[in-house]
Amino acid sequence: METDCSPMELTNNTESEEDSDYRDFEEADVKDMRLEAEAVVNDVLFAVSNMFVSKTLPCAEDVAYINVETRERGRYCVELTDSGLRVVAYDFDQTDDSLQNPYHETVYSLLDTLSPAYREVFGNALLQRLEALKRDSQS
């Protein structure tokens, strides 16, 4: 019977795979808030006038800042941390330490409180998706 590797090589390969899995687990444990912020922006950009991750304010493992302009033309700087999202200023690329706005668990909750137009656009998009699913299931 031919083998591609000896049993000793197989043992060494298994050990390196375990080490690799452990390293992947360690790396996955560390969050990059910039990536989280980009995902938030991509998720709801369709429902606001403008939204982007700040290039002026610092991003780190534990914090990122997102600039949001609602359809009503309200401008906000939003802080994203493990605690959630909260408005930290009423203009782009700013922070105001005197503001004590509450954290929201999701971007949907935050935008729901800031923008009635967001609520309408998001609700309409959801309705269209549900109607499309219904049509697909009937055909």
UniProtKB/Swiss-Prot annotation:
Where does this chain mainly localize?
Answer: cytoplasm
| Record's subcellular location | Cytoplasm
Q: Region Disordered: what ranges?
A: 1-23
Please list which residues make up the signal peptide: none
From the UniProt record, which GO molecular function terms apply? kinase regulator activity; protein kinase A binding
Q: Name one Pfam family in it.
A: GSKIP_dom
UniProt record, GO biological process: regulation of canonical Wnt signaling pathway; regulation of Wnt signaling pathway
Q: Can you tell me which residues the record assigns to a coiled coil?
A: none
GO annotations of cellular component type: cytoplasm
- Supply the alphabetized keyword list: Cytoplasm
The record's family statement is: Belongs to the GSKIP family.
Q: What is this protein called?
A: GSK3-beta interaction protein
